[in-house]
């Protein structure tokens, strides 16, 4: 074979760019909304324009592309819409840091318009990198439909959705206790707050009862908030305080008189059983304040400092105010003590700041009217969630939904489409271009709300905006909405999935997708190195890479699977992996890991393993090409003479049909790891290690007729074309490269259709590319009765021969002589003999009526068939000596343990577990001895 036509080694770099350009140039990614084919659509979870792709992006997009390619080959009109997300807080934060580092300026040093220009510039650069990387991964997106969550179409959809909900009264504005990030100075939704267990203190503070010498003591983790206290609460059933309910106490420093109230929410066992109520700075206190109509006093500024309601502490930070208040309470004799205490502290997922419950006027979506429909979509299976274990999580989220705070105090994002009158409380919600008519007539009297919408508001409309909503006449919307499936990580089941169901169904009264597949989160292996003091640090660099590749760990280094993090040194860059191993190896690795659990342990060595498989695929195909190079497409069109098919041929066709059936089932439930494993095993084990090895003697002319050889070649070409089709959705680059070589080798397909064996392969060859060829279908032949049982016996006969070779320590390169004794299964043995020779390393196999008397042999039995291997004379003496030594050792051991167990003293005084262990040891030794005796007898 010409080296230029088919190089010995596969080089991903030399083919991937050209293959992708061929696909894109040929328009194979573009969907046709007017097509009569059934639709299959996916909208890409848009990556944030904050940087570059990470391994999570590589995973989710590999899985989507696998589905899209599979469905495209099945004849669906597929539409995969790519896009990017503006990611409000995240992008604004990144750009602010960039401007600080590059220009030494803060956001507030710019006008809003100037700052947003910098963000748009960042977005363009980042988006270009991201989209280029998606192409590198092999994503067959419809780039003509590329979207951005702040493009004009998305902006129109967001304003329309806001107005619809506003007009229905679902969107409202009011004071509410929000999660306030004092660094970013914006409200966060509940699910944007991460909770950490932190060590702190529980402070005990006394309040004096008005007109009494009595004091009441409370325990609190936040003494600085006493400046905003509006009540003390106790349980009505707590006898210690029942006489004080209705009395008043004085708040230190601000001298405010506040009531002591009874409330059943108070846990009498916590602290002293009395708690301070600060409705403006604690969520539980806020509920209590609403129930008892208490005043709500905000004591903090937006930056986390004490405001004018803090009296002498005004202007201090939260931390300094706490210290000063404790010192002042001690001076007044009102501080009792402090105790070590661990509590869950809310932290901003973006800035890391401690979240401050903060009374602020915000925009909200009322969720009560959506709760029933959100449940019904999933309970009725209009939306199916995979894995099904996450259904419970979804329903729990829905049952506990709270009104959604949708306003953010940012500059980057969708501006809230509401105008406020400067002179009264009138507001206008407007979803058109420009501004409302009233504003245009009198612009000095109106101002647009300065806040932007939560990123998830626009992301919640993503499936609709991708297909042209609110234009109800959009062909894309009619053809491709609802989408087939949403593929995303389980960590944003509530962040995004639930909100998409809410927002999309509120707009068009249908679900946004039929299925949801939630993949696990990727974990990488990190290594902690401990010093003599027990302190540790993360190993990085070349040492970490050596450990990843299997180097033994020193005693002071411990490996642990952890979420990917730069600080832990366990981040794996997908682009680096593509450069090192090729996109196909990376895709196959990710698919093979995409189990249905919550965690994906991404072992670095898997990339090496699957790169080896890609090479195996190339080399296996190269071998097949060497034997089908004389074939033409016309030969395949003529079909196959099934009378010339042997047991091994029926076996491989049966295995292929079984593969198709299993893979189809796994696609239907998104078991990507099983799809990858089945395809991998079929090519590597069934096709290459078994079938090719069996038919090599025929291919090389050592056995069989010319007609049988021609049949095998046609079958090989057919199998290769079909397996390339099966593998293509996962490893598209190499399969397309090989498919094009097949087309070039076999030539143009004429009008013939082939037969039930070759017909589909002929049909595939007519296609311009593997990615648009029809997906393989079962190959129909007259399978012989008992096929699987017969081939199973052949495999066990081979295993027995290999086992004898191993036990007898025969040279694996030395061809063996074997014989078979079976009077009842002679015909079956006849068809098994070629398989035994090819796979068992046997030179000859004779069918005998009885064992040869003049030979030394070792014997095994399979289903009543005796199979023997002739041993070389010089081997007999060595093997007998070895077995005799082993026999002597076992006999001594058995004698020793038997005497010990016969001792009544040992049986009564020894630990029962030791006695049982000795009995087990004796039984094992006796079994081993019997095996040795049997082997000696066979010699």
Swiss-Prot record:
Subcellular location: Cytoplasm
Coiled-coil ranges (or none): 874-939
Alphabetic keyword roster: Aminoacyl-tRNA synthetase, ATP-binding, Coiled coil, Cytoplasm, Ligase, Nucleotide-binding, Protein biosynthesis
Principal location class: cytoplasm
Catalytically driven reaction(s): tRNA(Val) + L-valine + ATP = L-valyl-tRNA(Val) + AMP + diphosphate
UniProt cross-references to InterPro entries, sorted A to Z: aa-tRNA-synth_I_CS, aa-tRNA-synth_Ia, Anticodon_Ia_Val, M/V/L/I-tRNA-synth_anticd-bd, Rossmann-like_a/b/a_fold, tRNA-bd_arm, tRNAsynth_Ia_anticodon-bd, Val-tRNA_synth_C_sf
Motif ('KMSKS' region): 563-567
GO biological process, one term: valyl-tRNA aminoacylation
PROSITE patterns found in the cross-reference section: AA_TRNA_LIGASE_I (PS00178)
Pfam hit, one: Val_tRNA-synt_C
Disulphide bridges, residue numbers: none
GO cellular component: cytosol
Annotated GO MF terms: aminoacyl-tRNA deacylase activity; ATP binding; valine-tRNA ligase activity
EC number(s) recorded for this UniProt protein: 6.1.1.9
Residue numbers binding ATP: 566
Renumbered ranges of motif 'HIGH' region: 47-57
Keyword Protein biosynthesis part of the UniProt annotation: yes
Function: Catalyzes the attachment of valine to tRNA(Val). As ValRS can inadvertently accommodate and process structurally similar amino acids such as threonine, to avoid such errors, it has a 'posttransfer' editing activity that hydrolyzes mischarged Thr-tRNA(Val) in a tRNA-dependent manner.
Domain notes: ValRS has two distinct active sites: one for aminoacylation and one for editing. The misactivated threonine is translocated from the active site to the editing site. The C-terminal coiled-coil domain is crucial for aminoacylation activity.
Subunit (UniProt): Monomer.
Similarity-based family: Belongs to the class-I aminoacyl-tRNA synthetase family. ValS type 1 subfamily.
Name this protein carries in UniProt: Valine--tRNA ligase
Organism whose genome encodes this protein: Chlamydia trachomatis serovar L2 (strain ATCC VR-902B / DSM 19102 / 434/Bu)
